[in-house]
Amino acid sequence: MDAKELHLVIVSPEKTVFDGPVKWVDFPGESGRFQVLVNHAAIISSLVGGEIKYQCGEAQFRVKRDIQTLNIKGGFVEVNNNKVSVCV
C-alpha cells in the first residue's frame, strides 16, 4: 500500500467485515456525515446508524469497481497514519 491509499479495517462482534486498501471512506457521524481521505488528521469519533461508504484501492479495484456500502447501527472509528479502524 502506498501513500495514495488508506488501510481500512471494519470489525463487528461476529467477524472482520473488511480489511484492505481504500481510496476514501465516508461515515455517518453524530454531527453529520464526514469523509476520510489519505493523510487525514488523527481522530477518534463515534458513529450513528447509517451507511459507511468506501471505494476499494488499486489492488482490489479491478474486482470491485463500485463504491461499497455497509449499513450500521452505530460504532466508533479511529484514524491514525492512514489506517482507519472501525468497530461496528
Language-model segment annotations:
Residues 6-88:
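Compact, glycine-rich, soluble single-domain proteins
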Residues 1-5:
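Short, charged, intrinsically disordered terminal tails
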